[in-house]
């Protein structure tokens, strides 16, 4: 068999293989889409919610109703970081004190979108000890906590070094960027906008 003929036959075989592969991939995608369109974990909690009040009092739900879960999560007591004397007084719409105007923007955006959050809730990282991420947010539907670190002084070399080290420790402790933790950054030449923050919240929650 000549090299030219071998090349043509090989190209045809490769084409046929890729067409079959593409067809199977498309079938898998359709199956996933069908599953996602029918998947509704809320139905599991709805079974309890639909019970009459008298019957609810007799039942111990296997899955805690979402309203109770969120309320319990939001009311968790904790000790955050203290504020230094002379630090600027900046308060969120929810009435809590934060350290910067950018943190206020993030907090107010979370509040406006109905995302439960804690400010500077203590988290333990192996190899670093206790840290206080700016926000721990609750993805209500997934019942999943997502951290949010806002690094607002990246133009400062000492701050930047410390921030990058902290980010490295998050990774080593299993926090996946964009899945378990959100990072936003600012410097003297760049400030984050409310539109960007809103986009992050909509895409994540």
Regions found by a protein language model. Give the residues of each.
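Nuclease-adjacent, charged terminal/linker segments that flank catalytic cores
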Residues: 1-73
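Acidic, metal-coordinating catalytic cores used for nucleic-acid/nucleotide bond scission
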Residues: 124-127, 154-158, 187-191
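Short, charged/polar micro-motifs that form catalytic or ligand-binding hotspots
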Residues: 15, 93-100, 156-160, 186-187
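Active-site metal-binding core of divalent-cation-utilizing nuclease and nuclease-like domains
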Residues: 96-98, 111, 116-141
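Basic, glycine-rich
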Residues: 172-205
């Amino acid at each position: 068999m000549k090299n030219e003929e071998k090349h043509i036959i090989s190209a045809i075989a490769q084409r046929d293989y890729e067409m079959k592969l593409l067809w199977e991939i498309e079938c898998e995608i359709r199956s996933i889409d069908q599953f996602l369109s029918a998947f509704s974990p809320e139905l599991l909690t709805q079974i309890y919610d639909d019970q009459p009040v008298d019957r609810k009092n007799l039942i111990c739900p296997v899955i805690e109703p979402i309203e109770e879960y969120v309320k319990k999560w939001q009311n968790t007591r904790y000790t955050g970081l203290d504020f230094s004397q002379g630090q600027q007084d900046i308060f969120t719409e929810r009435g809590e004190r934060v350290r910067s105007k950018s943190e206020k923007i993030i907090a107010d955006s979370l509040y406006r979108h109905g995302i439960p959050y804690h400010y500077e809730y203590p988290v333990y990282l192996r190899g670093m000890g206790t840290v206080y991420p700016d926000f721990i947010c609750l993805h209500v539907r997934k019942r999943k906590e997502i951290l949010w670190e806002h690094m607002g002084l990246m133009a400062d070399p000492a701050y930047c070094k410390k921030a990058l080290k902290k980010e490295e420790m998050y990774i080593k402790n299993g926090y996946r960027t964009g899945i378990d933790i959100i990072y936003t950054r600012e410097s003297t030449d760049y400030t984050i906008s409310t539109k960007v923050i809103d986009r992050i919240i909509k895409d994540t929650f």
